[in-house]
Amino acid sequence: MSITPQEALQRCIEHRELFHDEMTDMMRLIMSGEMAPELVAGLLVALRTKKETVGEIAAAAQVMREFATSVHIDDRSHLVDVVGTGGDGAHTFNISTAAMFVAAAAGAKIAKHGNRSVSSKSGSADVLEALGANLALSAEQVAKCISTVGAGFMFAPNHHPAMKNVVPIRKQLGVRTIFNILGPLTNPADAKRILMGVFHADLVGIQARVLQALGMEHALVVYGRDGLDEISLEGPTLVGELKDGVVREYEIHPKDFGLHTAPTNSFKVANAEESKRIVLDVIDNKPSAASDIVCLNAGATLYVAGIAPDIASGIAKAKAAIASGAARQKLDAFVAASQSN
C-alpha cells in the first residue's frame, strides 16, 4: 500500500493533496469495508475540510466504478446521463426526470443514474415509482430497457452494493462529504456524455475537470445562480462545458433562448405525488413555466447527446417531442418495459 489511513489523515489535516495512487488505495479500503469506521469518518471530514481536489475526486470515482455493478450497452451512440448532485435545498419537482423522457423522445438514449430523496422532497427514484415504474431491475434488464425504449434508470443501491460499508458512517456524520459529489460521476452504464447539476458554484469548474480526467466526451456541469442544481429559469446559470477535451466556463440565461423567467420557488413540491402531477402535466403538453424549465434542460441534454447542434435547437426539439405526444409515449413505454422485466 502506498500510504496508511493514518498517514492519509495526517496529510489531509496538513492541507496536502493525496496522490492518485494514495487516494485509490484509501478508497478501495473504504469501499471494501477494510478501513475502521472511525478512520473512514476522520478521512472523509479531513478531505472535506481541506477541500477535495480534482485528482482526488477522479481517483475516488474510478474506484467506485470498479466496485459497481455495470450495465453493458452495445450501441452507445447518443448515450447520455442527466443527473444532479441534489442537496440544493430547492425542493423542486423532478426536472431532470421529466427531461429524461422528453430528451429520449427527441432521439437521445438516456442512461439515468439516481436514488431516492436524501435532502429533497422527491428524488428521481421516488417520482419514477409514483409514475408506476419498477426499480428492482437487474443490470441486464436495465440494458434491455435502454436498448429497446431509449431510456433506462439505474437505481443506485442496485448498482453500488459496496456503499453499504459507507452509508451508516455518512448518516452518523450528517455533513456533506466527497460521496455527495461522487454519485453523478459513477454512472454504471459508463455514459460518456452528461448534463450534471451541482449544489455549489465552486463545483462547476471542479466537476467539469473531473469529468475531463475521467475521459468524458461531452459534458455540461450547471449551477443556477439561484442555487438550483439544474439549468434555472429564474436567472443566470453558471456552466462548465467539457467538449473536445477542453473545459470552458460561461453563463447562460433563459432570455438567451426566448424563454420567460420564473422564480424557482414556483416549482416547489411537498412530495413525490405532487412532483408526479407536474411531470405528467409537462409531458401531456400543458403550457407552463414548468414545461419551459423541462424543455430548457432537455434541450441541453440533446445538445450534450449530439442530437442538437446547440441548446436552442435542443429546446425546439424538446418542445416538438412534447407537442407530438412522443414524450408521453416514451414515458408509457418506459413504465411498461420496467414492469414486464
Curated annotation (Swiss-Prot):
5-phospho-alpha-D-ribose 1-diphosphate binds at residues 84, 87-88, 92, 94-97, 112-120, 124. It catalyses: N-(5-phospho-beta-D-ribosyl)anthranilate + diphosphate = 5-phospho-alpha-D-ribose 1-diphosphate + anthranilate. Its cofactor is Mg(2+). Anthranilate 2 binds at R170. Pathway: Amino-acid biosynthesis; L-tryptophan biosynthesis; L-tryptophan from chorismate: step 2/5. The keyword Transferase applies. Belongs to the anthranilate phosphoribosyltransferase family. This is Anthranilate phosphoribosyltransferase. It comes from Polynucleobacter asymbioticus (strain DSM 18221 / CIP 109841 / QLW-P1DMWA-1).
